[in-house]
Curated annotation (Swiss-Prot):
The EC number(s) this enzyme carries: 3.1.3.84
UniProt-recorded Gene Ontology molecular function terms: ADP-ribosyl-[dinitrogen reductase] hydrolase activity; phosphoprotein phosphatase activity
GO CC entries: nucleoplasm
Gene: POA1
Keyword tags: Hydrolase, Protein phosphatase
Protein name per the record: ADP-ribose 1''-phosphate phosphatase
Limits of the Macro domain: 1-169
Amino acid sequence: MGYRLSALTYVQGDLFEESPRPAVLAHACNCLGSWGSGVAAGFKQKFPGAFVEYKRHCDKYSDDNSALLGTCQLIETHDAQTGELVYVACLFTSVRFGARVDGPEQIVKQTKLAMQDLQKQLAKMSGPIDGNSTVHMPKINAGLFRVPWRDTEKVLEEVGQPCTVYVID
């Protein structure tokens, strides 16, 4: 059972195992086409087709990967094990990753823009996924991007898209 704080609901559990289907599963992404570690590696394993689309999308911007910042790539895919329908929302919040990750203030700014872009895309959809759909995510930016969760939480609340945040502690 979760608790509600503005647009956010928190639940204890694994995003991949406990989110409903169909669902929108979001995570913060770099703009270079790498899902090599952290939760991104889990997305790559569960949704290999989505990774191929994400990588192809990033490669189109190889001359200026920063053009992806503040956008969301919404990919329709299927769970590699169950075949269930999932939409993977790639929130482009940092150009780079690792030691060269963008600064926290920049990442938070891009998170707000990317979530607003996701909202616009969902508003155009109908069926089981639409503008009223809840977005399911881990504590984005708080891991390898090293952004304090309270900063990301604040912009998610400002955007107002219903989100369920999965916490594993």
